[in-house]
């Protein structure tokens, strides 16, 4: 919204700063961060008042969770979503289709998560919205986003899958492009949701991945950068950098209260929204495969559940002591803080590898 102040600028005054994506990204970051700091505690108090028992804790999970996490309120993702949405609307250009695409996916998946969290805390049970209904809604939203991306992408990128590292390599997905987008976005949302099981475990890798994808979005949205890096130019995606900066600011504001011992959990409201956002950004920037690298922690968490369920159905035995895999490490005797920080370190390493794909050709 503030971008429109440039219309009254003569090019030499302070309003001219709003032309620059980097300036507005910084503004979005600090707006979301300050919002989180100011409204975090009041929101937690409200959630604690409204949620009699807090987030239901799995009885078959690690025993320590029943002692340390019982009664902690959930739906803290509302803080991230509110900060993120406000900052994005305030600092991003409203005439940019990619911003609206990513924001649509984020808020829509947040609503699915809110419905799920609401049923859980109301019933004091893990039985929220049924898995099939949740997946159906998620795939529906992702399908709309895929169609939107198809309309926004310029030729010859529309409907194509870009391969990282390989120069000028595109795979024409044709009618499979929208189903592919559905898998990427819905898969990302649910993978982050599975990762959100320990204090601070999901939010930091999400912020690292968002920051990485934000840099990629900024780079592929500039013709000079894409010419130098020899990557595909996707005009308009640079504005996504404002969104990812707001996400990081809101995420840090949330982490202030989610740091161990957590005063609030993000819940499905936050994890589905943030995961969906990562998937949507990857689709918008034509870096879906890079998301698999940058979001490697989420991929491993999701695969651990898939492998565990499939193997147990076939043999009646388990591959892991417990899935998702972070619970396996808990059962092995790792401290919660060890798991969280080590996963953060791995996320940072994967982010650097993901950024390297911009240059390696």
Curated annotation (Swiss-Prot):
A GO BP entry: cell wall organization
Record-listed E.C. numbers: 2.7.8.13
Localization of this protein: Cell inner membrane
Domain of life: Bacteria
Essential cofactor(s): Mg(2+)
Pathway, per record: Cell wall biogenesis; peptidoglycan biosynthesis
GO molecular function: metal ion binding; phospho-N-acetylmuramoyl-pentapeptide-transferase activity; UDP-N-acetylmuramoyl-L-alanyl-D-glutamyl-meso-2,6-diaminopimelyl-D-alanyl-D-alanine:undecaprenyl-phosphate transferase activity
GO cellular component, one term: plasma membrane
Membrane topology: Multi-pass membrane protein
CDD domains per record: GT_MraY
Enzyme's top EC category: transferase
Keywords: Cell cycle, Cell division, Cell inner membrane, Cell membrane, Cell shape, Cell wall biogenesis/degradation, Magnesium, Membrane, Metal-binding, Peptidoglycan synthesis, Transferase, Transmembrane, Transmembrane helix
Protein name: Phospho-N-acetylmuramoyl-pentapeptide-transferase
Annotated organism of origin: Dinoroseobacter shibae (strain DSM 16493 / NCIMB 14021 / DFL 12)
Gene: mraY
């Amino acid at each position: 919204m503030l971008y429109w102040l440039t219309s009254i600028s003569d090019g030499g005054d302070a309003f001219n700063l709003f032309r620059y994506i980097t300036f507005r990204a910084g503004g979005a970051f600090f707006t979301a961060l300050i919002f989180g700091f100011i409204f975090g505690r009041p929101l937690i108090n409200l959630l604690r008042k409204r949620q009699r028992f807090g987030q239901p804790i799995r009885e078959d999970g690690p025993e320590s969770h029943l002692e340390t996490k019982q009664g902690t309120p959930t739906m803290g993702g509302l803080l991230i979503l509110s900060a993120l949405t406000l900052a994005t609307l305030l600092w991003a250009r409203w005439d940019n289709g990619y911003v609206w695409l990513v924001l649509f996916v984020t808020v829509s998946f947040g609503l699915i998560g809110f419905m799920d969290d609401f049923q859980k805390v109301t019933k004091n049970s893990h039985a929220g919205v049924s898995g099939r209904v949740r997946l159906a809604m998620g795939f529906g939203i992702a399908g709309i986003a895929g169609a939107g991306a198809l309309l926004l992408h310029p030729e010859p990128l529309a409907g194509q899958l870009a391969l990282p590292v390989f120069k000028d390599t595109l795979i024409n997905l044709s009618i499979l492009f929208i189903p592919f987008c559905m898998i990427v976005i819905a898969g990302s949302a649910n993978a982050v949701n599975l990762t959100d099981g320990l204090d601070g475990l999901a939010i930091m890798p999400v912020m690292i991945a968002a920051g990485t994808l934000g840099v990629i979005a900024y780079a592929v949205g500039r013709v000079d950068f894409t010419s130098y890096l020899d990557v595909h130019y996707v005009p308009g995606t640079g504005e996504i950098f404002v969104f990812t900066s707001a996400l990081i600011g809101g995420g840090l504001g949330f982490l202030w209260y989610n740091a161990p011992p957590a005063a609030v959990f993000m819940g499905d409201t936050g994890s589905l929204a943030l995961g969906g956002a990562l998937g949507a950004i990857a689709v918008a920037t034509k870096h879906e495969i890079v998301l698999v690298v940058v979001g490697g922690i989420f991929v491993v968490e999701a695969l651990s559940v898939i492998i565990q369920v499939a193997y147990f159905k076939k043999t009646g035995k388990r591959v892991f002591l417990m899935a998702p895999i972070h619970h396996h490490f808990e059962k092995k005797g790792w401290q919660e803080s060890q798991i969280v920080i080590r996963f953060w370190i791995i996320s940072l390493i994967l982010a650097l590898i993901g950024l390297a794909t911009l240059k390696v050709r």
